[in-house]
């Protein structure tokens, strides 16, 4: 049995793409996933399965297409994936920065292209780490936040709708939920 985090993009944001978590948990349980749990309303779902990841991705894509067609991108990571990522995080990730976010790669995303685009940005008072699961992005000061490449350019990037973003607090909570 493998424990997974399913990070869904763009649900329950600003009253759009409404998903009732209790219903989603039941539907995913009916799909054959076990120990299905959610954390907050923004698309953090956890479950256990013996099904290989590749097959799970196919199953979830088909499920979302029928039941939640507005869910077109998601990230699926195992507890093992998460723990390996944490082992390789840079020292700055544990420091007290103004803001820290993880831009999770979604299934099927051209990661090399995303990295190339982000590497071309001129950073302002911010720091990056390219991980296996996503891009870890730290902003040093709240005062300079609006000058950062993160604030000025990220929304305009062609891949923006194909990543799902979580802050550092949620990233830590994902780790806790994966251990359950």
Give the positions of each predicted feature.
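Surface-exposed, charge/polar-rich loops and edge strands
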Residues: 2-42, 46-180
């Amino acid at each position: 049995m493998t424990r997974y985090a399913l990070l869904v993009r763009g649900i329950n944001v600003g009253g759009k793409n409404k998903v009732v978590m209790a219903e989603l948990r039941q539907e995913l349980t009916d799909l054959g996933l076990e120990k299905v749990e959610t954390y907050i309303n923004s698309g953090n779902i956890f479950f256990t399965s013996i099904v290989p990841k590749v097959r799970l991705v196919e199953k979830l894509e088909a499920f979302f297409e029928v039941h939640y067609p507005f869910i077109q991108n998601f990230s699926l990571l195992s507890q093992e994936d998460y723990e390996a990522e944490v082992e390789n995080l840079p020292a700055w990730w544990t420091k007290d920065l103004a803001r820290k976010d993880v831009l999770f790669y979604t299934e099927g995303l051209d990661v090399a292209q995303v990295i190339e685009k982000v590497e071309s940005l001129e950073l302002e008072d911010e720091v990056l780490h390219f991980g296996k699961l996503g891009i870890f992005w730290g902003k040093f000061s709240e005062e300079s936040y609006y000058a950062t490449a993160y604030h000025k350019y990220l929304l305009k990037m062609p891949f923006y709708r194909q990543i799902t973003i979580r802050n550092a607090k949620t990233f830590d909570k994902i780790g806790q939920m994966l251990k359950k």
